[in-house]
């Protein structure tokens, strides 16, 4: 009888083509997502070597990072480098026979939102993209992670990837989430617990009652930020919630093929007694709404907490780093988080740009008005999310409250398009990174859930969503 295996072990074993004595492995790749920023050199490499894309049907391309999200984006992209990258992806996709969603296609959106929407992302698959947040797709019980541009070329040419196997980590989140606490708060709490290097060398499996109770949107939020915890990938075993989400998606199996697929997908779970190299446990019932205070995703506290004092940190290097973060963020130790005023609010990104996130925002802001001191924007994660939100009348709620309702794209998550912070501006953001300059030169980012961001937009400062009315 074979030894018990983790979910990661099973997917790895199913895709192992070859293993060398030093542990170097060749893995088969089921799905390859491509965007405009990390693919131009890869396609040029194919062109120069006279190669074709080995499996165009397993490759999907979309523009997301550079595209404007303003209503007039049909007028074109102002920045020359961004425009060239977008134009080049369209040309490369046509030349190499890869399906492509342009900015004028309603299926266009952030790469990690459109994959699941289209049924391109399925349980048990290996999925790669030249983007660190590819871990999002692990919410379906797939092994998904980012790759570099040279690896993008390798996958395009061979449909394989050279890898070494990571270690297994289990993050067990039991208990029931309190009202007002979301998947975003769970993952920020996890990163606060293990640190941004805590997952280095691991693939994380998320399990427990709180994880099981999440929708697919919530699970994608969790897996999306695995990389911020240092992990190679994050995954959640598929279940009935997963199967229901997949049913009816354009590229998902249908009929008997779907039933056969579900029978296989039900085997995709860690065996009882499977070995994890590290286990981390959290009690969801004790989690508060969380706000980041520094320039790392591990710099988090309860919304009812205060800005911490770095002098209480023993490690000299870390202490200096946290003082630098406070200086950059313009904050002082001891400041209550609810006393921090904000200038901007960004709701969107591959972390929190889905329909469930937008519904949560609408519930908070309906009948209210954005503070006069705040500029707030909502960017749907895809054209289909935008279409659904408008069908439900959410856009009317947002506009009536004073939010800017935008076109789909990565937007202000990263300063690679027109949406960015000005120096010194402070933003409540539903995105995944609060690094220095991430949202714009000298911009200050606080990571929060969609509901927390929405409430901050109305109040003009951070508030405890649990006390919101």
Curated annotation (Swiss-Prot):
Designated name of the protein: 3-isopropylmalate dehydratase large subunit
GO biological process: L-leucine biosynthetic process
Complex and partners: Heterodimer of LeuC and LeuD.
PROSITE patterns given in the database record: ACONITASE_1, ACONITASE_2
Cofactor comment text: Binds 1 [4Fe-4S] cluster per subunit.
Keyword Iron: yes
E.C. number(s) listed in UniProt: 4.2.1.33
Transmembrane segments: none
Annotated signal sequence range: none
CDD domains (UniProt xref): IPMI
Cofactor: [4Fe-4S] cluster
């Amino acid at each position: 009888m074979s030894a018990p295996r983790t979910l990661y072990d099973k997917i790895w074993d199913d895709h192992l083509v070859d293993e060398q004595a030093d542990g170097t492995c060749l893995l088969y790749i089921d799905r390859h997502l491509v965007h405009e920023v990390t693919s131009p050199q890869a396609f040029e490499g194919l062109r120069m070597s006279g190669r074709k894309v080995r499996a165009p049907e397993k490759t999907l391309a979309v523009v997301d990072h550079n595209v404007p999200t303003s209503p007039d984006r049909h007028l074109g992209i102002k920045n020359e480098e961004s425009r060239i990258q977008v134009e080049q992806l369209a040309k490369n996709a046509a030349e190499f026979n890869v399906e492509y969603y342009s900015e004028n296609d309603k299926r266009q959106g952030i790469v990690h939102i459109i994959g699941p929407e289209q049924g391109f992302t399925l349980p048990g698959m290996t999925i790669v993209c030249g983007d660190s947040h590819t871990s999002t797709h692990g919410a379906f019980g797939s092994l998904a992670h980012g790759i570099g541009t040279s690896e993008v070329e390798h996958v395009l040419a061979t449909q394989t990837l050279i890898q070494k196997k990571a270690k297994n980590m289990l993050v067990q989140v039991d208990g029931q989430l309190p009202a007002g606490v979301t998947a975003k708060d769970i993952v920020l709490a996890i990163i606060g617990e293990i640190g941004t290097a805590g997952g280095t060398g691991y693939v994380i499996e998320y399990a427990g009652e709180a994880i099981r109770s999440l929708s697919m949107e919530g699970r994608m939020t969790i897996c999306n930020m695995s990389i911020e915890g240092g992990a190679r990938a994050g995954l959640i075993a598929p279940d009935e919630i997963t199967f229901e989400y997949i049913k009816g998606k354009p590229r998902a199996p249908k009929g008997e093929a779907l039933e056969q697929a579900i029978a296989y997908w039900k085997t995709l779970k860690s065996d009882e007694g499977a070995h994890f190299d590290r286990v981390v446990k959290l009690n969801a019932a004790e989690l508060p709404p969380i706000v980041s205070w520094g320039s790392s995703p591990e710099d988090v506290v309860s919304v009812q907490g205060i800005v911490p004092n770095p002098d209480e940190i023993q490690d000299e290097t870390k202490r200096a780093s946290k003082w630098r973060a406070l200086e950059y963020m313009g904050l002082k130790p001891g400041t209550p988080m609810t006393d921090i005023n904000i200038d901007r609010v960004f709701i969107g990104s591959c972390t929190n740009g889905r329909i469930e996130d937008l519904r949560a925002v609408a519930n908070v802001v309906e009948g209210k008005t954005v503070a006069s001191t705040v500029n707030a924007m909502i960017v749907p994660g895809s054209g289909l999310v935008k279409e659904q939100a408008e069908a439900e009348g959410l856009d009317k709620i947002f506009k009536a409250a004073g939010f800017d309702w935008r076109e789909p794209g990565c937007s202000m998550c990263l300063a690679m398009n027109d949406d960015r912070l000005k120096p010194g501006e402070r933003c409540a953001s539903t995105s995944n990174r609060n690094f220095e300059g991430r949202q714009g030169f000298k911009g200050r980012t606080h990571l929060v859930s969609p509901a927390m961001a929405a409430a901050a937009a109305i109040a003009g400062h951070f508030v405890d969503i649990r006390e919101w009315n």
